[in-house]
Amino acid sequence: MGAFTAGLARGFFSSVTMGSCRYDVAMFTDYSIQAIAINAIPLIFAITIHEAAHGYAAKRFGDNTAFLLGRVTLNPLKHIDPIGTVLIPIALVLANSPFLVGYAKPVPVRFDHLRNPRIDMIWVALAGPGSNFIQAIFWAVFWILIQGFSINEPFLISMAKAGIFWNIGLLVFNLFPLPPLDGGRILAGILPYRQAVMFGKLEPWGFFIVLGLLFTGVISQWWMVPLSDFFIAIVRPLTSPLRMVFTP
């Protein structure tokens, strides 16, 4: 589970706002040490908790594989893949690629060990994106508290924004309905058995299909942007009561 944990076309956040603030898209194209730290800290949390959530959900529904291998942990080193999490993103950045894509070390899930494989597979797949949604809310609350207490610290403000949008981005991207993404697992669990088997045959080619769709801008324009707006629109009212506390 969770072979892909990041696939973000640069600039797809440009139309997204939270309250009266807009996300600074330049944060994606600024590769200073400070900008890297601003993005890396929430991104490491986003990836680590995403993968651990898959393992925890699998254990909850009967498969202890990830737990026995020590993957139900918040230690990011357990989830980092040297190639997919480090080398590929760095190479794309240095090449000034129009998109960033990477993946963490997949959390092993034995679907045949789940008590109700067809249904439980959906919940295990949803756990990762669900954790990113919760983290987006956390970072939104952090942002509101910073503003509410008049903490004028650009580093913390930028990190809060990055935390919201990396998590929304990972949430939306991983819900794309193509294996090995979480959305593909969810769709496979919903489809009738025969159609699910046929759909599963796409998985060996999923990585290349996703790259092609990223390169052509299809995922960014027709999936990432509208669904990011949708989930931001959900986060905003959930955090509005706290925002009202600090509004004169």
Residues of each region from the PLM?
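Hydrophobic transmembrane alpha-helices and their immediate loop junctions
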Residues: 4, 10-13, 19-248
